[in-house]
Amino acid sequence: ITEAGYEVDGCDDVRCFVESGFSNKDVLVFPLWRGGASRNRTAIVPAYCEARNIPFIRGDAYVQAVCQDKSLSKMMANAAGISVPGEMVLQSEDDLSSFSPSSRLRGPFVVKPLHSACSIGVDNSSLCHNDDLARDRAANLFAEGLGPVVCEEFIEGEEIALCFIEEQGTIVKRCVGTYMGIDGKSPF
């Protein structure tokens, strides 16, 4: 961006952004902030931009809130006719004592934070082949402050990303991306 002749300012938190006076400048905001413990953390900057009529790149506050909630986004995908894996949501550590994913789901299971993106809280221990491993992984996520937790059926295959560019209510560009490992194969 700077090579194209534009000035780039960065803020480490929402307060810095709000107090910076960006609303008084001719700007375009790239809301990449992912901090804080709120499940709405990716929606905060877009919501502020919308309220102040500051142009920004990425989904609006509603899109961010839906996409951050893995269970809600799967429910919406299912309502649109897209098959989704079965899941169980653990809202708190109190749910761990009765957590037995094999009673409702086909293994193996993927256990990860319910409200995160960018693979936050996902590592090799997220793929769990039995109830004990799933319970341990969920307990670790709660201990790391990454709860609520979702446990879902593992679906082998390519990871697909759908991208849309919208201008004033009209989709003007679509793209589909698939994730491949360095060997050119799907790692899943």
Question: What residues fall within each predicted segment?
Answer:
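Conserved N-proximal alpha/beta basic substrate-recognition cap immediately N-terminal to
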Residues: 2-90
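Short, active-site-adjacent cap segments at secondary-structure transitions
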Residues: 17-18, 117, 158-161
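Short, flexible active-site-adjacent loop segments at beta-strand->alpha-helix junctions, enriched
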Residues: 35, 93, 114-115, 155, ...
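Phosphate-binding site of ATP-dependent enzymes
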Residues: 131-188
